[in-house]
Every structure is written in structure tokens, then in C-alpha cells.
Curated annotation (Swiss-Prot):
Membrane topology summary: Multi-pass membrane protein
Gene, per the UniProt record: PTGS1
Residues with attached carbohydrate: 68, 144, 410
InterPro entries recorded: EGF-like_dom, Haem_peroxidase_animal, Haem_peroxidase_sf, Haem_peroxidase_sf_animal, Oxylipin_biosynth_metab
Note: The conversion of arachidonate to prostaglandin H2 is a 2 step reaction: a cyclooxygenase (COX) reaction which converts arachidonate to prostaglandin G2 (PGG2) and a peroxidase reaction in which PGG2 is reduced to prostaglandin H2 (PGH2). The cyclooxygenase reaction occurs in a hydrophobic channel in the core of the enzyme. The peroxidase reaction occurs at a heme-containing active site located near the protein surface. The nonsteroidal anti-inflammatory drugs (NSAIDs) binding site corresponds to the cyclooxygenase active site.
GO cellular component: cytoplasm; endoplasmic reticulum membrane; neuron projection
Biological role stated in the UniProt entry: Dual cyclooxygenase and peroxidase that plays an important role in the biosynthesis pathway of prostanoids, a class of C20 oxylipins mainly derived from arachidonate ((5Z,8Z,11Z,14Z)-eicosatetraenoate, AA, C20:4(n-6)), with a particular role in the inflammatory response. The cyclooxygenase activity oxygenates AA to the hydroperoxy endoperoxide prostaglandin G2 (PGG2), and the peroxidase activity reduces PGG2 to the hydroxy endoperoxide prostaglandin H2 (PGH2), the precursor of all 2-series prostaglandins and thromboxanes.
Documented EC number(s): 1.14.99.1
Documented activity regulation: The cyclooxygenase activity is inhibited by nonsteroidal anti-inflammatory drugs (NSAIDs) including ibuprofen, flurbiprofen, ketoprofen, naproxen, flurbiprofen, anirolac, fenclofenac and diclofenac.
Natural source organism: Ovis aries
Cofactor note (record): Binds 1 heme b (iron(II)-protoporphyrin IX) group per subunit.
Subcellular location as annotated: Endoplasmic reticulum membrane; Microsome membrane
Effect of mutating residue 385 to F: Abolishes cyclooxygenase activity
Protein name: Prostaglandin G/H synthase 1
Length: 600
């Protein structure tokens, strides 16, 4: 046989042979499950997939070893054995007032405050780790501040169920879930006596760093400062800032109405503000955050901070007559950042916590500790902070109740009533309880629906995984979560497994601590984000925290002695009742609070 005929027949013989089993594939065989869908790595170990069905846990510096990071080192075992549970710590901090009165008057307060700050802040990774596009360490996650960071990587896309390997193949409808478990039946006031002054402060304060980009998507932010930079007062970019500035003596633009200072109109400061069509530019107030025209309570705070900025500029000008406009403006901004952080820690967070330990803003407490003065806002923090149960059924100002339809985009209420009247009214009206479910007014329920939908786009891990990440034990049943049977049974029917419960519903449906505004998870997850963001601000660093940064001792003292009462009463003609909690009924008939001294 010739060599040529053999070469021609050989391919034909190959076609007649059965295929090699190496290349065969059974179309009916199930695809291997991504092993990281089981969340095998415990105690902050990192799951790395190898091949199709293998994984390895990176337990570096977790204090644990073993295939799944479950074997504690001796010091880790000792620390976890001796560490009390979060619920026990909360009980200690909210009972025994006589003991805490003693602690607050001694050096023990500073020691405990330092411990609180370091333990809480250490739970937040710095530098940031992941984002919506990268579930692994990358330079992009570190350097691109357009992203929100994230604490846990997203649920892998190839998992058998939306949340991992547990629960049902399809998550419950977000609107049905919200109406069934989050919609208010009857207003439930916060047992800690929190008021609307607090609720509006929360909205006003957080809108400087929660600014999700509608154009880029839910994993992106327009607030590139990632913290307390007062972009909601000065604008989040230089162009907007320049439109709002007077460029004289460091001050911001303003207008005089009824003999009082208010933000300028959009006609005077041409910046984008979101108002309904038909409202003329001269009736729109221009401030740093474009959405603050939505609620009179937000524009109230915008007005107060505008007055405070210009007041501080006058004080600095008197101290430093040679300073130019730019230095006066920039120094006043730093002072207001300091005042904000002081009020947030010592009054706002104090009210939220319900602790008898008096919280203290003193950056020097951390000067001897290992601490990074930078912050990146996490998408989980943004999700967590949707506290719409705070909002009431209606808004009472003076003798009149305003419905949502009358209150939203009400451009005349602030000027008609004046700052003092609104502060007094909002300080006296109770806010709603956040936790426990079924306390969001129907007018704003759509926000909760959108939050749940957004969390699915972000592919947040289950609620229990976040509890483990923040040092809490995962819930073993829906009844343990809610503390009752009815909602628990319905949630079981919808989700199928407690380990498939979503992040935001878990936070809002968790049973509250006794006489508390919300449950354990909101405190244990929210506090680390808050304290790391506040104390991670550059003004709290050793390089910045000195009198010269704030224009000398006068400016430094403004920061060190700031209170909500001073913020309001030094910028109004009379001093109304102002607080983050409703007044004690026993004090209702007492004379008004004395006006604080005009200078510190």
C-alpha cells in the first residue's frame, strides 16, 4: 500500500472510532457548585476558588487556622472566651445609672471611650477592600473613590440560589415584602423619646456622604469625600461651591427675609436644585445638597449651618483682620466640620445608644493607638442607614398638622414660621421606632422597596453572614430574629431558611432591645461605620488637631464646646426648646431654656 493511500485512509479510520472518554460530557450531569457559595471560611477568612470545585481559605491574621479558619490560636480562644456578648454589654451600659454617674466623673470614662473607639473602628477594613466590580483585592478598589466600598464580597453569580446555596430559588417580591412586614399599621413611637429634630438631623447629616450616582448605578457615589466634609453645605464640587460663596470675608451667600438670614435663591446662586416644576427660581433656596428643598426640616438645618458659617467668619475676621476671603472660608469650614463631629458623637450617637456612659469627642484618645485617618463609605452602611420608620404620620407645627402632601416641597413654611418655631415644633414631636418592623408610613414605603431591590443588584450576602462578620452569633430561626411567631412563620414561608434572609429586612425586622429604638445588629454594625468615619476625619489626626488649624484658641474652643443648643441659639433671636429627644412631661411648663453666651 502506498504511503499516499495510507495518509488518505487514516482520517477516515479516525471518524469511525468512538470518541475518547476524556472529551465526553454527560449533558445531564449537574455543574459543580462554586464552593465559595457555601461561605466555608469563618472568622473573616477569605475564600479563594481553585479549579471548579476546590477552594482554599486564607486565614492570615484572623487569629484562626485550619481548612476553614475555625481553629483558634491560644490568645484568640482566651479573648473570645472572656469577651461578653453584645447584648450583655448593652445591658450593662443601659442600667445602673448611679454607677455610670461615678464613671463619667473619673478617668475611667476616657479609658472606656478609647476602648469603644478602637474596638469598633478595628471592625472596618482600612484601606478599603472590595467594591461592586471587584470581589477580590485590587488597585481599583483602593484608588477609585467613585465606588462605594463593601465589607463583604458579593454573592457569587453562579450560586444555586440568589443568596448562596440556601433558601428558595427566587426571592420574595420586594413590594410585597415591604407591604407585609414594613408598612405601618399604627405609629409606634421610639421608646427612647427620639424626636423629629433628630430625624431631620440624621437625613441632613448623612446626605453629605450618601449620594448614590443615578447615572453610574447603585455601587457608585458622587460624594467623593467619603465622610464628614460638609459637602451638603458647601457643595460636592468646586463649581457649586463657588456659586454659593459670597467671596467676601469668607462668607456664603444669603438673603434677608423678614429680617432673618436664609439661604440665597437659585436666582442669586444659580445651582441645580431639585424642586417640582412650576416653582420659580426666586422661590427656590440654593444650598450645597440639591435635594434639600424636599423637606422643610432639611432646609431648616441648611439655614442654621449657613448662619453658623457666616457667624464663625465674623469671629475669625475679628481675630485675624489680615486674613483674606479664602483663608477665612477654609478655616470656618474646618471649624464647622469639628462642630459637626462633636455634636454627632456627644449628642446624636448618645441619643441613639441610650447608654449611661457619656460619649466623648476627644481625638487625643487615639493618638497612642494604631489608627488610619482615612475613610471610605461602604454600600452596607448606606443600606443600613435608611431609617424611614423615624418619620411620623403627619407633621405638627404650632396648632396645625401637615400631611405629607402639604409638607413635601413646602417652600414657604420655613420663612412663614421662622427657624425658632420649627426647631421647637420638631424637638417636641416624637419620632418612630426604627426596629421591629411595620412602622414605615405608606407615603415613603417606596424607599424601602427600592433599598431591597438595590441590595439585590449589589448582591449583598445574607444577614447572618454580616452578623458573623461583626462578631455576633448568627440567628438559628426566624422566631429568634423577630421574637414572635406570626411574622417568623411568614418569613419562613417566603425565604425558606434563616440563612437566606436579606440584609436590610433583617435589620428592620430584628426584635429591639428592651426600651430601645432598634435591635442588636443595627448597633453592632452601625457603630463601627459611624465611629470610624467620624474619628477617621483628617481634623482628628495629630497633624490637624491643634489650635492653629482652627485659627487659634477661639476657633479651637468653638469645636471643643459645640452643642446642638449653641448651634441653634447662637443663630436665632430667641432660644427655643432644642434637643434630640422630646421634653420630659414634668418640664413642659417650666420656663424656656436660657440663651447660651454669645461667645465662647
Amino acid at each position: 500500500m502506498s504511503r499516499q493511500s495510507i495518509s488518505l485512509r487514516f482520517p477516515l479510520l479516525l471518524l469511525l472510532l468512538s470518541p475518547s472518554p476524556v472529551f465526553s460530557a454527560d449533558p445531564g450531569a449537574p455543574a459543580p457548585v462554586n464552593p465559595c457559595c457555601y461561605y466555608p471560611c469563618q472568622h473573616q477568612g477569605i475564600c479563594v476558588r481553585f479549579g471548579l470545585d476546590r477552594y482554599q481559605c486564607d486565614c492570615t491574621r484572623t487569629g484562626y487556622s485550619g481548612p476553614n479558619c475555625t481553629i483558634p490560636e491560644i490568645w484568640t480562644w482566651l479573648r473570645t472566651t472572656l469577651r461578653p456578648s453584645p447584648s450583655f454589654i448593652h445591658f450593662l451600659l443601659t442600667h445602673g445609672r448611679w454607677l455610670w454617674d461615678f464613671v463619667n466623673a473619673t478617668f475611667i470614662r476616657d479609658t472606656l471611650m478609647r476602648l469603644v473607639l478602637t474596638v469598633r473602628s478595628n471592625l472596618i477594613p482600612s484601606p478599603p477592600t472590595y467594591n461592586i466590580a471587584h470581589d477580590y483585592i485590587s488597585w481599583e478598589s483602593f484608588s477609585n473613590v467613585s465606588y462605594y466600598t463593601r465589607i463583604l464580597p458579593s454573592v457569587p453569580r453562579d450560586c444555586p440560589t440568589p443568596m448562596d446555596t440556601k433558601g428558595k430559588k427566587q426571592l420574595p417580591d420586594a413590594e410585597f415584602l415591604s407591604r407585609r412586614f414594613l408598612l405601618r399599621r399604627k405609629f409606634i413611637p421610639d421608646p427612647q423619646s427620639t424626636n423629629l429634630m433628630f430625624a431631620f438631623f440624621a437625613q441632613h447629616f448623612t446626605h453629605q456622604f450618601f449620594k448614590t450616582s443615578g447615572k453610574m448605578g447603585p455601587g457608585f457615589t458622587k460624594a467623593l469625600g467619603h465622610g464628614v466634609d460638609l459637602g451638603h453645605i458647601y457643595g460636592d464640587n468646586l463649581e457649586r461651591q463657588y456659586q454659593l460663596r459670597l467671596f467676601k470675608d469668607g462668607k456664603l451667600k444669603y438673603q434677608m427675609l423678614n429680617g432673618e438670614v436664609y439661604p440665597p435663591s437659585v436666582e442669586e446662586a444659580p445651582v441645580l436644585m431639585h424642586y417640582p416644576r412650576g416653582i420659580p427660581p426666586q422661590s427656590q433656596m440654593a444650598v450645597g445638597q440639591e435635594v434639600f428643598g424636599l423637606l422643610p426640616g432639611l432646609m431648616l438645618y441648611a439655614t442654621i449651618w449657613l448662619r453658623e458659617h457666616n457667624r464663625v467668619c465674623d469671629l475669625l475676621k475679628a481675630e485675624h483682620p489680615t486674613w483674606g476671603d479664602e483663608q477665612l472660608f477654609q478655616t470656618a469650614r474646618l471649624i464647622l466640620i469639628g462642630e459637626t463631629i462633636k455634636i454627632v458623637i456627644e449628642e446624636y450617637v448618645q441619643q441613639l445608644s441610650g447608654y449611661f456612659l457619656q460619649l466623648k469627642f476627644d481625638p487625643e484618645l487615639l493618638f497612642g493607638a494604631q489608627f488610619q485617618y482615612r475613610n471610605r463609605i461602604a454600600m452596607e452602611f448606606n443600606q443600613l442607614y435608611h431609617w424611614h420608620p423615624l418619620m411620623p404620620d403627619s407633621f405638627r407645627v404650632g396648632p396645625q398638622d401637615y400631611s405629607y402632601e402639604q409638607f413635601l416641597f413646602n417652600t414657604s413654611m420655613l420663612v412663614d414660621y421662622g427657624v425658632e418655631a420649627l426647631v421647637d415644633a420638631f424637638s417636641r414631636q416624637p419620632a418612630g421606632r426604627i426596629g421591629g418592623g411595620r412602622n414605615i408610613d405608606h407615603h415613603i414605603l417606596h424607599v424601602a422597596v427600592d433599598v431591597i431591590k438595590e441590595s439585590r443588584v449589589l448582591r449583598l450576602q445574607p444577614f447572618n453572614e454580616y452578623r458573623k462578620r461583626f462578631g455576633m452569633k448568627p440567628y438559628t430561626s426566624f422566631q429568634e430574629l423577630t421574637g414572635e411567631k406570626e411574622m417568623a412563620a411568614e418569613l419562613e414561608e417566603l425565604y425558606g431558611d434563616i440563612d437566606a434572609l436579606e440584609f436590610y429586612p433583617g435589620l428592620l425586622l430584628e426584635k429591639c432591645h428592651p426600651n430601645s429604638i432598634f435591635g442588636e445588629s443595627m448597633i453592632e454594625m452601625g457603630a463601627p461605620f459611624s465611629l470610624k468615619g467620624l474619628l477617621g476625619n483628617p481634623i482628628c489626626s495629630p497633624e490637624y488637631w491643634k489650635a492653629s488649624t482652627f485659627g487659634g484658641e477661639v476657633g479651637f474652643n468653638l469645636v471643643k464646646t459645640a452643642t446642638l443648643k449653641k448651634l441653634v441659639c447662637l443663630n436665632t433671636k430667641t432660644c427655643p426648646y432644642v434637643s434630640f429627644h422630646v421634653p420630659d412631661p414634668r418640664q413642659e411648663d417650666r420656663p424656656g431654656v436660657e440663651r447660651p453666651p454669645t461667645e465662647l
